[in-house]
């Protein structure tokens, strides 16, 4: 079934200001529908929760506000951050273990990361990989061995910064980006498999159904919810639990302004429906949130070009080792450097990238001298010349003492020079509302490792669980591709099992 169009700005304001206050059970009367576990949102976290709850024997119903499953997960690249010794890693000749995986993720996910969740995720990663295989997700046993946002090949394994400084000094470099067998974006294939697995396990679905309010009984336990379906009010009784997997809040400008203003004015990585509805419904019951300022930011600077040249800020200065995971250089740029940002490359570097791997990226300016390029870019005279001269002097010796880019990407840049504008986007499509950046939110409801939504005292809100981007997962101030789909499904599964039994860990 086709997805309805993304909401207009006016519609998002109306939706944002609608009441999310909980409804008393005594005010409902007879419910229109009833089940044991009610899952709200049919992206990857919702599919995982529904699958596990149904497999545990619960009567499960999934509500999805769009016309079919998928959500923002289906529009993603489909990368899954998995490791610890999966069959794909072994087939590609890499030895990994949970402790090594943990050492990388603890650093890469940044300050204030949830180390308890990271530890569980790493220890359970091989089993989680097996679960994807059980759900019908296939992975090719081949490695994409160069920096990229997403391989256009069907390779099943990719590097996600593990082999770049400083992370290669903290953990043994092992690639952990697992990709479903698909050319290009694999999120759609991933969601086809996961949604089919959930319904195959026995979960029912109601699409075109938007949850609006949670229902509380006289003790304060979540007992169901109120929704709108085809313009009519519909009520749902959840005998055991409600699981919120409704996504983040990047499509809610008011919430962004309050919690994560760094994303204001940039593009949105979403299906247009990540408006924080689940977070708002839960907080209206007294639920707490965590890390609401944490975001993912993607700069449309092509890694294949960046690593062969340099990434500079608006003053012509390098600020990062360009072979690092591109999400890291994106955050460095947008959060900490004066824009605009430019990829500086020479003719040899540009031509060395296969045309199929250029993603339609073309230089905005090409000049014979750096002085001419500085003038075109509006940089201070001599700034870029100084940067390139310093870079070239050390690159001749295979060194990068300031930023530690790997020697295999180091060589002196020579005329003619080119500047590539990230704001032009890939395939000429523009990017980030003209800023060259787009992102999504990572903060959300405060949850236990079993998905129990916690209140401000740290106690569970009875009958309420959450996972995916509606919850605050493993992330601190950092992000790595595959950790959103990865922790959404991993902790979605835990939430589904806990919801089915009506409690958290014993």
For each feature predicted by the language model, list its residue ranges.
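Extreme N-terminal leader/targeting segments of oxidoreductases
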Residues: 1-37, 55, 474, 478, ...
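Conserved redox-cofactor binding core of oxidoreductases
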Residues: 13-15, 120-233, 253-254, 395-420
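N-terminal Rossmann-like FAD-binding beta1-loop-alpha1 element of flavoenzymes
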Residues: 37-62
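Glycine-rich FAD pyrophosphate-binding loop
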Residues: 55-76
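Rossmann-like flavin
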Residues: 96-166, 367-390
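Glycine-rich loop(s) and the adjacent beta-strand/alpha-helix scaffold that form part
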Residues: 185, 229-299, 485, 491-494
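A glycine-rich dinucleotide-binding beta-alpha-beta segment and adjacent secondary-structure elements
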Residues: 213, 383-478
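An anion/pyrophosphate-binding glycine-rich loop and adjacent beta-alpha core
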Residues: 275, 279-281, 285-383
């Amino acid at each position: 079934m086709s997805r309805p169009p993304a909401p207009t700005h006016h519609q998002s304001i109306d939706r944002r200001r609608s009441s999310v206050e909980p409804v008393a059970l005594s005010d409902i009367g007879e419910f229109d529908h009833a089940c044991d576990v009610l899952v709200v949102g049919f992206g990857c976290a919702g599919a995982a929760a529904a699958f596990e709850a149904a497999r545990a024997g619960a009567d499960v119903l999934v509500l999805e506000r769009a016309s079919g499953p998928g959500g923002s997960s289906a529009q993603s690249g489909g990368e899954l951050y998995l490791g610890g010794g999966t069959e794909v890693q072994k087939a590609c000749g890499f030895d990994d273990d949970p402790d090594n995986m943990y050492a990388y993720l603890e650093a890469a996910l940044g300050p204030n990361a949830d180390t308890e969740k990271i530890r569980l995720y790493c220890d359970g990663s091989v089993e989680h990989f097996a679960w994807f295989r059980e759900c019908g997700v296939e992975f090719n046993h081949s490695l994409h061995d160069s920096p990229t946002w997403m391989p256009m090949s069907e390779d099943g394994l990719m590097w996600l910064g593990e082999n770049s400084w400083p992370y290669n000094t903290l953990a043994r470099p092992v690639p952990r980006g697992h990709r479903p067998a698909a050319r290009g974006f694999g999120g759609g294939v991933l969601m086809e498999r996961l949604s089919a697995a959930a319904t195959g396990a026995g979960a029912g679905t109601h699409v075109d159904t938007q949850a609006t309010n949670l229902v509380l009984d006289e003790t304060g336990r979540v007992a169901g919810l109120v929704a709108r379906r085809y313009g009519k009010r519909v009520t749902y009784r959840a005998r055991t639990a409600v699981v919120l997997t409704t996504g983040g809040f990047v499509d809610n400008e008011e919430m962004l302004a309050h919690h994560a203003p760094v994303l204001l004015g940039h593009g949105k990585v979403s299906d247009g429906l990540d408006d924080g509805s689940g977070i708002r419904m839960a907080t209206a019951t007294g639920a707490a949130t965590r890390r609401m300022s944490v975001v993912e930011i993607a700069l449309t600077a092509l890694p294949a070009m960046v690593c062969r040249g340099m990434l500079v800020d608006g003053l012509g200065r390098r600020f990062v080792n360009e072979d690092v995971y591109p999400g890291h250089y994106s955050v460095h740029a947008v959060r900490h450097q004066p824009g605009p940002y430019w990829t500086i490359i020479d003719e040899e570097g540009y031509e060395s990238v296969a045309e199929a791997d250029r993603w339609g990226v073309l230089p905005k300016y090409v000049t014979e001298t750096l002085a001419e390029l500085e003038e075109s870019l509006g940089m201070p005279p001599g700034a870029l010349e100084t940067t390139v001269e310093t870079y070239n002097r050390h690159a001749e010796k295979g060194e990068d003492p300031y930023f530690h880019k790997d020697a295999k990407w180091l060589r002196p840049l020579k005329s003619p020079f080119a500047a590539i504008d990230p704001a032009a986007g890939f395939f000429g499509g523009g990017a980030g509302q003209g800023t060259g950046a787009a992102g999504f939110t990572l903060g959300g409801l405060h949850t236990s490792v079993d998905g129990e939504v916690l209140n401000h005292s740290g106690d569970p809100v009875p009958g309420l669980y959450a996972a995916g981007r509606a919850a605050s997962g493993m992330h601190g101030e950092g992000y790595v591709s595959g950790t959103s789909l990865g922790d959404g499904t991993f902790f979605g599964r835990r939430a589904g099992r806990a919801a089915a039994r009506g409690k958290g860990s014993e």
